[in-house]
Swiss-Prot record:
Disulfide bonds: none annotated. GO terms for molecular function: DNA-binding transcription factor activity, RNA polymerase II-specific; E-box binding; protein dimerization activity; sequence-specific double-stranded DNA binding. Residues 100-154 form the bHLH domain. SUPFAM superfamilies: HLH, helix-loop-helix DNA-binding domain. GO terms for biological process: axon development; positive regulation of transcription by RNA polymerase II; sensory organ development. The keyword Transcription regulation applies. The gene is BHLHE23. GO terms for cellular component: chromatin; nucleus. It comes from Homo sapiens (Human). This is Class E basic helix-loop-helix protein 23. Transmembrane segments: none annotated. May function as transcriptional repressor. May modulate the expression of genes required for the differentiation and/or maintenance of pancreatic and neuronal cell types. May be important for rod bipolar cell maturation.
Length: 225
């Protein structure tokens, strides 16, 4: 402080100007450091500093911002047209429609299962050994398998009966036809078919002449005299 007081007024002003110039130079260098890092403000091969890029004109900036806003408006208009005028109402109705659709699907599935259970109960009622007290309620798969085996067994039984009937019909066709003798009513006396004056021949001849029945069927022809 004593040294400052000893300085004259002109020297003090010169010293203050020197300090101000040094501070301004430091501030200018600090401001130019980012430009130097980007390549601006550094001398080129000829010693000239490259020119900094010219700032964009206000008209061009306004035009570009207008184009961007126009594109955004077009995109918004397209989205609005795609959604349609009732998009908000559709959004409010969608949860209720989904709930009603889910309830209808559940009700339809419940009815289908009830119908299936009723059909299986009716099938168990007509299958033997499926509704016995000693047998617990069969499952769906077991009921279907038992019904399949029962149907196959019935089909085999029908085939056996058809073969048996065909065999019996074939045996009757090969056998000689036999005429049965007329049956006399109960309580009436048998009338002798031979006249009193007719010559009596052997029993086989008489049987054949009267009724046409072979003598092999007459028990009197085989009796011993």
């Amino acid at each position: 402080m004593a040294e400052l007081k000893s300085l004259s007024g002109d020297a003090y002003l010169a010293l203050s100007h020197g300090y101000a110039a040094a501070a301004a130079g430091l501030a200018y260098g600090a401001a130019r450091e980012p430009e130097a890092a980007r390549g601006y403000g550094t001398p080129g091969p000829g010693g000239d500093l490259p020119a900094a890029p010219a700032p964009r004109a206000p008209a061009q900036a306004a035009e570009s911002s207008g184009e961007q806003s126009g594109d955004e408006d077009d995109a918004f208009e397209q989205r609005r047209r795609r959604r349609g005028p009732g998009s908000a109402a559709d959004g409010r109705r969608r949860p209720r429609e989904q709930r009603s659709l889910r309830l209808s699907i559940n009700a339809r599935e419940r009815r289908r299962m009830h119908d299936l259970n009723d059909a299986l109960d009716g099938l168990r009622a007509v299958i033997p050994y499926a509704h016995s007290p000693s047998v617990r309620k069969l499952s769906k798969i077991a009921t279907l398998l038992l019904a399949k085996n029962y149907i196959l067994m019935q089909a085999q039984a029908l085939d056996e009966m058809r073969r048996l009937v065909a065999f019996l019909n074939q045996g009757q066709g090969l056998a000689a036809p036999v005429n049965a003798a007329p049956l006399t009513p109960f309580g009436q006396a048998t009338v002798c078919p031979f006249s009193a004056g007719a010559a009596l021949g052997p029993c086989p001849d008489k049987c054949a002449a009267f009724s046409g029945t072979p003598s092999a069927l007459c028990k009197h022809c085989h009796e011993k005299p």
